[in-house]
Amino acid sequence: MLRQKYDFEMFPVSALEKVRGNVRPQLFEAENTAFVGERFAFQVAYRSIGVLRSDLAYRLEGAPEENVWVYLVREVPCGYPVAEGSDDYVLEAAPCMMPDLLMPVSPSGITAKSGMWQAFYIVAEGLPAGEYTFRFAVLDREGRTIAETDYRLRVLGKKLPDADL
């Protein structure tokens, strides 16, 4: 499910996606599978279109609160993104700001920069086997939903073997 107003865009993406300001995220992902005991993450990319929105809030439903953490992804300076002799498979060749820092976020006081892609990073851990539908919503300061999206996670009743690294 995806519901949004015309001036706000939001959808789920892979945890591997680098959600960068002016680049539309490409790794759309609305469902995945994990094992019992595995830590799993996904992102919700969002942007406000044409207006700076402040004092936004979020709501996350679909899993026990003690098993889910929400972070905001913040950009940090990247002064040396490519070493000499590197291949051509790079996100940026010049110094820039890159999304990298995960900051714990309170459910309110969130800002959406006009035209800039940003992301929430959602981590689930310790979920029992079963099917989960995470419903993530962004709310305006009056508590009205301005965008909403779902992410389905299937937790298998098997456990990964211990790694000997």
Where are these regions (language model features)?
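Short glycine/proline/serine/threonine-rich loop/turn segments at secondary-structure transition edges
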Residues: K113, G126-F134
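Short solvent-exposed strand-capping/beta-turn motif centered on an Asx-Ser/Thr pair
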Residues: R47-L52, A63, L127, R141-G143
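Contiguous beta-strand segments within globular domains
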Residues: L27-R53
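Short, hydrophobic beta-strand segments
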Residues: Q118-L127
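An acidic-aromatic substrate-binding cleft motif
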Residues: T145-L165
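Surface-exposed binding patches on compact interaction domains or structured appendages
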Residues: M1-Q26, G50-Q118
